[in-house]
Curated annotation (Swiss-Prot):
Pfam families for this protein: DUF402
Entries under NCBIfam families matching the protein: PRK13662.1
Cofactor(s) this protein requires: Mg(2+)
KW Metal-binding (keyword) present: yes
Name this polypeptide is given: Nucleoside triphosphate/diphosphate phosphatase
Stated family: Belongs to the Ntdp family.
Amino acid sequence: MGFPKEGEKVQIHSYKHNGSIHRMWEETTILKGTQSLVIGANDRTVVTESDGRTWITREPAICYFHANYWFNVIGMLREEGVYYYCNLSSPFAYDSEALKYIDYDLDIKVYPDMTYTLLDEDEYEKHSQIMQYPPVIDTILKRNVAQLTQWIHQRKGPFAPDFVDMWYERYLMYRN
């Protein structure tokens, strides 16, 4: 597995545990790419859902993917401040086609005041039965929910006060 290079434009593909495509982001600019970490940015990019419907993102976003954690984080820049959407997912993989991960349903939405809500627990329970997630997946995801909430409280990693703004400034250099 390689990793995307700085300045490269890539697609992001989200899959379900059973291998079916969940969602695709058409274009994300890579701001940092290493074996263990990818930071990207996009703005008004086309998103295609598994049923073929498409929509366009409304605001600039900074995307954080790590090879050692079972989550990814999207920081969305809005007028009221930065909102974060955190997907509990497999660590990322990258090939010539796209940056890829498996979406495990659970999400955490973080508000500008750093309060947060765990979302889609019902969807997780349903899909864990239908797709037969092994018990180890449940253990890993619970551990990563705890890790993620700790990062939120500590303002660590993508939740650090200047993280999103700093990477957005870098993204602007590629847009002009």
